[in-house]
Amino acid sequence: MEASGTDDVEKLKSKFLSAWHNMKYSWVLKTKTYFKRNSPVFLLGKCYHFKYEDSGVTADDCSNSGSDSKEDLSGNVDEFRKDFISRIWLTYRKEFPQIESSSWTTDCGWGCTLRTGQMLLAQGLLVHFLGRDWTWTEALDIFCSESDFWTANTARKLDPSLEKSSPENEEYVSLGKQPLQNSEKKRYSEDLHRKIISWFADYPLAYFGLHQLVKLGKNSGKVAGDWYGPAVVSHLLRKAIEESSDPELQGITIYVAQDCTIYNADVYDLQCNKGNEKAVVILVPVRLGGERTNMEYFEYVKGILSLEFCIGIIGGKPKQSYYFVGFQDDSLIYMDPHYCQSFVDVSIKNFPLESFHCPSPKKMSFKKMDPSCTVGFYCRNAREFEKAAEELTKVLKSSTKQNYPLFTFVNGHAQDFDFVCTPVYDQNDLFTEDEKKRLKRFSTEEFVLL
């Protein structure tokens, strides 16, 4: 009887907190985000300039982008805007089906790191299925409450012709020259776009949805309503993709680095499993300092975000998690999950997509960043992994101020260095004892999220 009364109190408490958080995060302070005209902007490996083409800007201005192609340089703000809006935005939601073994129907106030982890994986899947150059054809139709930001000191008014996809943006999916073929490719890419979003839906059967991640988190001692750090979320995403049964997801896997070390042979084994070459998402949990972020690491972070292989960073500032996607000068560009939106039923044909795309980026100073974060990369095959390892090694060795790089690549398997790499799992226990200890250690090191 007493236990029943305690359960009722806990349910009442969670309902009160849910109502409070739903109200709190349904209101957003509208602050304008400004970008400088004279500095390049980097977004997940692409470089943009907010200048007119006759302004004398050259590709040398983007020399630290890590890319050999001058085509990455753009003089059009709208191209940057379209690219940014096309990234999948996953935020707090309310009124979704109740999470198993809990009374939660919202993740407001506790699920922000799960959301930023989802966004990073979603970007990896977009690149995997549609290519980095893909953009959503309706991106420029998204209403931006900060419309002044797009025009102040930077851009002309939107040209209606820009709302149509350029040939460059459609190159990955538009393989034929016939209008019918182009139309079919366009429909195919939009179907994939919707399918990727549906994998992150807020209902129990979604492979990478909140319900599934919380379910997997139980094996590491987490429950709905707990906070999750970037490293813990990395392992949950890895488990989620291992558990997925969709045939289209069998061609991609996730590797989580151990103690800031990527073991090349382990990555190759994942990519060439059973003779079938797979793409790999590499997640590297790191710390950028002790209690505070060491400013000397910023050059590393900028170099990483400039690479074409980068799919973002799960990080944030103390008590808040953000998805970092780029930078300008000393400011990071990010997507913010701290906005409560209503549940969307993705089982409905042509469900609305607008709430899954962020209309405007935000910026913050690097010095405000919490030192705990997870860096993400995507490699389509073993050859791309070799290239990524080469480029990243250059970036990680570029600073002479730090004696130790952010992370390293090591030849061989983790087990060669007395680490557990590819454990045999008990079908009833998703995490090995070694992993549980590591996750517990990560949990005590990472920042508390509200």
Swiss-Prot record:
Classification via InterPro entries: Papain-like_cys_pep_sf, Peptidase_C54, Peptidase_C54_cat
Pfam families, A to Z? Peptidase_C54
Question: Which keywords appear in this protein's UniProt record, sorted alphabetically?
Answer: Autophagy, Cytoplasm, Hydrolase, Protease, Protein transport, Thiol protease, Transport, Ubl conjugation pathway
Q: Tell me one GO biological process term.
A: protein delipidation
Q: Which superkingdom does the taxonomy of this entry point to?
A: Eukaryota
What chemistry does it catalyse, as a reaction equation? [protein]-C-terminal L-amino acid-glycyl-phosphatidylethanolamide + H2O = [protein]-C-terminal L-amino acid-glycine + a 1,2-diacyl-sn-glycero-3-phosphoethanolamine
> Subcellular localization, per the record?
Cytoplasm
* Cellular component GO terms, alphabetical: cytoplasm
According to the UniProt record, which cysteines are disulfide-bonded? none
Q: Which residues form the active site?
A: C112 (nucleophile), D336, H338
One molecular function GO term is:
protein-phosphatidylethanolamide deconjugating activity
* Entry's EC annotation: 3.4.22.-
Catalytic EC class: hydrolase
> Which SUPFAM superfamilies does this UniProt record tie to the protein?
Cysteine proteinases
Give the record's family classification: Belongs to the peptidase C54 family.
Report the PANTHER family cross-referenced here. CYSTEINE PROTEASE ATG4, CYSTEINE PROTEASE ATG4C
What this protein is reported to do is described as:
Cysteine protease that plays a key role in autophagy by mediating both proteolytic activation and delipidation of ATG8 family proteins. The protease activity is required for proteolytic activation of ATG8 family proteins: cleaves the C-terminal amino acid of ATG8 proteins to reveal a C-terminal glycine. Exposure of the glycine at the C-terminus is essential for ATG8 proteins conjugation to phosphatidylethanolamine (PE) and insertion to membranes, which is necessary for autophagy. In addition to the protease activity, also mediates delipidation of ATG8 family proteins.
Name of the protein this chain belongs to: Cysteine protease ATG4C
Native source organism of the sequence: Xenopus laevis (African clawed frog)
Q: What is the lineage of its organism?
A: Eukaryota, Metazoa, Chordata, Craniata, Vertebrata
